[in-house]
Amino acid sequence: MRRTSTADRRQARLSSGPLPGLERFEGGIDEAGFGPLLGPLCIGFAALEGPGDPWIALSGAVARGPSRSLPAVCDSKVLYPGEGGLGRLERSALLFLSLARGTRPRTIRELLEGPFSPTRETLDRHPWYRDLDLPLPRFVPHELLEADLARARGACDRAGLRVREAGVRAIPEGEFNAGVTRSGNKADFHVGLVAEVLAHLATLPRRGEGRILVDRLGGRRFYGDPLSSLLPEFLPTPLREDPARSEYLLHGAAAGARLSFCVGGERLSFACALGSVLAKYARELLVERLNAFFLDRLPGLRPTAGYVADGRRFLE
């Protein structure tokens, strides 16, 4: 398991401790694919509600770092590297999608279903994404997933924890490029996409105040103006905008929700870390489809992960 400093543990407690006298609603958002040259942008999102920290509530069922025996929820950049990385992502992603939806997605297409499902027409404009009815799981035995689910459900019941939402918003390359052109730059388009996802999380019914944490988007520090433009109905009020955290209080239909953009958000929020896992899992499955499409037509071509230098090699 990755070691954490005393400061990290203290910050995690301050950031994720229960709200006084209320059940704790925690939402989180993270992305995979904003920097690479090839493949989709995937935005993972999750929300949980209960009286305490989900990492503590699920400590016997879910690990906080890579584990041989349990599914893990942590930064995907920690969980994915090394042999079996996609299997580790799959084990955790399918567990929480099952907890949120009541059923496990059976195909890649079902994995992408939800409030931000890409339309079939959008996917069909990308021929490498037409074959998304491949069965899931790909890497983890069904029996192991069922055992994980039974263990996690028991832990949730004992702790009074509910997985309110879990999903992925996938933006294929053509949609991404068109959006960047409309917005004028990648950063503004990205903020617009994230704003729509956080609006969904912020307006989920909840029993009290809530907290939504987004892993900070690049080097951006000030979100007040774009949030006011994109979500005027929430009247976002800045609470702090410093190098480590930008925090806003939301009003209107999201009244009582506190929104934070944080450096290293996956260390501070279970929901944000889960968003990271969901986004990375979906992106890797879709990049695998992209590779399969082109390798079938160009024998000898080496697969790509989509990052800039290797993506250019793939395109040559």
What spans do the regions from the language model cover?
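RNase H-like, Mg2+-dependent phosphodiesterase core
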Residues: 1-316
